Structure formats: structure tokens, C-alpha cells
């Protein structure tokens, strides 16, 4: 066999090179054509052919992309498809793997939608900073939608089930057709200007891009952005997006979800109220217990400072003072008696008669009678003088003459001056034959 300088390839190698060339040379492409040979096996994938009058290309749309289609693919339907070129190596088939497909009439609308969305986004109409928050408790709601569509039934059903107390005004409008956008815009502006509503809901059910086109109107988008009342947009299904969704304060994927966002579930509210009541009862019981404890402490303090308790305390103090006074008086009397006894002993020791007897004995010892007589007279005079001096200082003598010794019962001190006592003060007066208690009366000193 002759030697060859060219590289020799196997079919699989050649198909792999061709696939790499196709996938690397062509970006994401859009194709408008007619559907043919449509099949959907049990795997959920979608296989068909796109053709025009002169050519055709095999196409595949794998699950789950095929499940999001908004229409039913059928023979002869004209579509706008987007995908990437590739090569199925096992058969060498050149094909287009799609990730999006819509009916062909929507192509121009899609391009217009993308252009307007980009322009409004550049103006900042979609910015989160300009969007308003929904009120915590919605009391009045305006619903702009078709009065006969499925959307209004879904919304009203959810609202009635979750929160029947909500006041809802249905503002009927066309939601499809040439005049729908202007009518929705007018109703929105009037509802916002009235100041009556807490939230305005714009909604309708699903449909094609053309069916939903009223909600991509530029005037409606700008009216939503200018509204002072928070606006919720719930247009179509979860996969549908309109300009009203982007510019609204809140976008809900479906009308039912919008209703759930706007009101709480009354069952959850009841549960929350019950929890709050239980908590309030617990707090009340705790507060009542604390108040009762404080009341008990105050009652104890009041009893401790009540007049009766005060009188009892004063009575105990009076009894104690009486005991102390009695003890003091006893001590004072004992001291006075001791002083009297000492004075009596001193008087007895200086008794003139005893002294006179001694002198007489001494006189008898003296022989000159005259000298003895003079000496005796002199001594008698001295004795009388001493006796008078002793009698002058004898307390018993003073008491015996009708005087009294006045002392304070509390400490036994002797009162020497009227200036030392006060009106009403109780004193003790010691007399010759006993003692009496006296009280100082007001008067001149």
C-alpha cells in the first residue's frame, strides 16, 4: 500500500471534528420557520423539523425546556426558535438544539419588548430604591382586571378564605386588545388619585406574549412608576414577565400568590392572637404576683409604723423607763439614807453632852476651882457653837424644819434651782416622814 501523508480519520473522529467546528463557529441563532414531523416520546423530549420552501433542519428540544412552552407544537405552525447548532455524532445528523420557542407572530413583539425594557431600565424605573414597601395591614384593596376572567375568581377566592374582612373594590377593565392598556392606565391613575386604597393590584391570567401585550405598554409602565399607592403586578403564569412586573413595587408570579402576599391567613392571625392572649395572661399573673408581694411588704411596714404598734413600743419604753426610774430612785434614797446616817453619826460623835461630860471630867481633875469654872464655860461655848454648826449642815434637820429635798426620778439628781425644771416635768420631793411625786406647773419662777 502506498504511503499517504494525509491524516486518516474514522467516522467518529470526523463527526467529532465537524461538531466542534459547528458549535465553535455559530453563536446562539434565531430561526423562523414552519413546524414539521413533530414527535414527543415518553421521555418528554420534543423532536421536529423546521422548514421553509427550499430547505429543512432537524431540531430537538429537551425536557425540561419543552415543558415550559406556552403553546402546543403542531404540524404546520409557524414558530420563532432559538438554539445552538450541533452534530449528532452517532448518525452524523446536523441539527439545532433549542432552548426557546414561541409562535412566530411574537417575534416582533419580543424585540419591541426587549428594547423598551432596556430603555426603561436605563431610566431607573426598575430600581429597587424607588419601589415602595407594602403596608403591614392592608384594609382597602383595588383590583384592576377583567370581571369575567379566571384571575379575579382566584384572587377573590383566596382573599375570602384568608382574610374576609378586607374591603375589596373591583375596577373592571379590558385586559387584552388595543384599548386595554389605556383603560388599565386610566383606572390606575384614578384609584391612585383617590387616596382610598392601601394597595392597587393589576392582574390577569396567562396567555401568549400578544395576549399579555397591554401590560407591556409604556404609558402604563410610567403610570405605575409614578403612583403614590403601592402597586402589585400579577400578570400571567410564573414564567411570564411583563413590563408591569418589572416596574411595579411587588411582582407576584400568579394572581393567587398576589392575594396571599397582600393579606395574612386569618387562621394564623387567630393563632397569633391566642398566643398573645396567653402571653398577656402570663404577664398579668406575673405582675399580679409581684403586686401582691409588694402589698404584703407594704402591709408589714404599715403594721410596723401603725399608731397601735407605735403605742405598744412607747408603752414598752415607758415600762422600761419606769423600771429604770425605780432603780434610780432606790439608789438615790439609799445614798440619801447613807448620807443621813453618816450625818447622824457625825452629830453623835460631836454630841455636846458627850463632849461636856468629858470636859466635866477634865474639870474635876483641875484643882483651882475658878480655873476649872472658866475652862468649863469656855468649853461649853465651843460645844454649843459646834452643835449649831452641825445642826446647820444636817439634812434631816432641814427636812424636819418643813423643807423638802427635790430630785429627778430619772437620775436622782438634786434640783437646786427653779430654772433647772420645765413645766410638766415630774419630780420627787423627800420629806421628813417619806417622799411624794410632784409635777411642775407653769408659772413665774
Swiss-Prot record:
Subcellular location: Cytoplasm
Enzyme type, top EC level: hydrolase
Annotated catalysed reactions: Exonucleolytic cleavage in either 5'- to 3'- or 3'- to 5'-direction to yield nucleoside 5'-phosphates
Alphabetized GO MF terms: exodeoxyribonuclease VII activity; nucleic acid binding
GO BP annotation list: DNA catabolic process
Enzyme Commission no: 3.1.11.6
Xref: InterPro entries: Exonuc_VII_L (IPR003753), Exonuc_VII_lsu_C (IPR020579), OB-fold_nuc-bd_dom (IPR025824)
Keywords: Cytoplasm, Exonuclease, Hydrolase, Nuclease
One cellular component term from this protein's GO annotations in UniProt: cytoplasm
Origin superkingdom: Bacteria
Subunit structure, interactors included: Heterooligomer composed of large and small subunits.
Role this protein plays: Bidirectionally degrades single-stranded DNA into large acid-insoluble oligonucleotides, which are then degraded further into small acid-soluble oligonucleotides.
Family: Belongs to the XseA family.
Name used for this protein in its record: Exodeoxyribonuclease 7 large subunit
The species this protein was found in: Xanthomonas oryzae pv. oryzae (strain KACC10331 / KXO85)
Lineage of the species this protein comes from: Bacteria, Pseudomonadati, Pseudomonadota, Gammaproteobacteria, Lysobacterales
Gene: xseA
